[in-house]
From Swiss-Prot:
Component that constitutes the tail found at one end of the virion. Together with Hsp70h and p64, encapsidates the 5'-terminal portion of the viral genome. Movement protein that is involved in local cell-cell movement via plamodesmata. At least five viral proteins, CP, CPm, p6, p64 and Hsp70h are essential for cell-cell movement. It holds the Pfam family Closter_coat. It comes from Beet yellows virus (isolate Ukraine). Keywords: Capsid protein, Transport, Viral movement protein, Virion. This is Minor capsid protein.
Length: 216
């Protein structure tokens, strides 16, 4: 138990610093704060990484600077469909067209490239960290292309129709691009492989197909 004088000091501290602390943090520029996050790269790391990957894409895919983000978007979509597990065998490929030019990108090229470029950041799962860093961009893009995620891997996670893109295993459920219902779907999808018996809902809305019949 605190001595009377100690309690007095604590009250004094609280009363004299609360307003000052609120004023300081209410106007604090978040760009001045950074941290080491095992799930994502910080702004400085991201800028450095993008510079390296952009040059590799330009050299090996023969692309333009202005189209780089589009190529990056397709890599994120592919990662969502095959998962970012370290156990994935990169034996497939994906194809798309930009500006009338067709690109065939092999998994065995793009994901090892990402791992190589991520090596200096020493992350346990470099591909997952890479994709999670750009999850906001992925969400915006994937919403526009829902039919690209109709596959067995994502289907097994029991995600409601129209939300299949939320089955990507690199989503953190913290993106400002997600509403509460969508965050619940992401969280439920990540648990599905571990415990499919868990049921959940947000405002009566289905967040997992495994809940069908339980909420009626």
């Amino acid at each position: 138990m605190l001595a009377p004088e100690a309690r007095g000091d604590l009250i004094h501290f609280t009363e004299n610093t609360r307003d000052a602390m609120e004023t300081f943090f209410n106007s604090y520029d978040l760009a001045e704060y950074s941290e080491v996050n095992p799930n994502k790269l910080n702004r400085k790391e991201t800028d450095e990484l993008l510079g390296v990957i952009r040059e590799r894409f330009k050299s090996e895919l023969v692309i333009t600077d202005e189209d780089f983000v589009k190529h990056l978007a397709f890599a994120l979509i592919r990662a969502a469909n095959i998962t970012t597990s370290v156990k994935v065998n990169y034996v497939g490929a994906y194809e798309y067209t930009i500006g009338g030019k067709k690109f065939l990108v092999k998994d065995a090229w793009v994901f090892p490239l990402i791992k190589e470029c991520m090596k200096k950041f020493n992350k346990p799962n470099p591909v997952r960290t890479f994709c999670a860093t750009f999850e906001d961009a992925y969400i915006v893009i994937a919403r526009s292309l829902p039919k690209l995620f109709l596959n067995r891997t994502i289907g097994k996670r029991g995600i409601p129709s129209g939300y299949e893109f939320l089955g990507a295993d690199f989503l953190t459920a913290t993106s400002v691009c997600l509403n509460d219902h969508e965050k619940a779907i992401v969280l439920q999808a990540s648990r599905a492989a571990i415990d499919r018996a868990v049921s959940s809902s947000v405002d009566g809305k289905i967040v997992s197909l495994f809940d069908l019949g339980r909420l009626s």
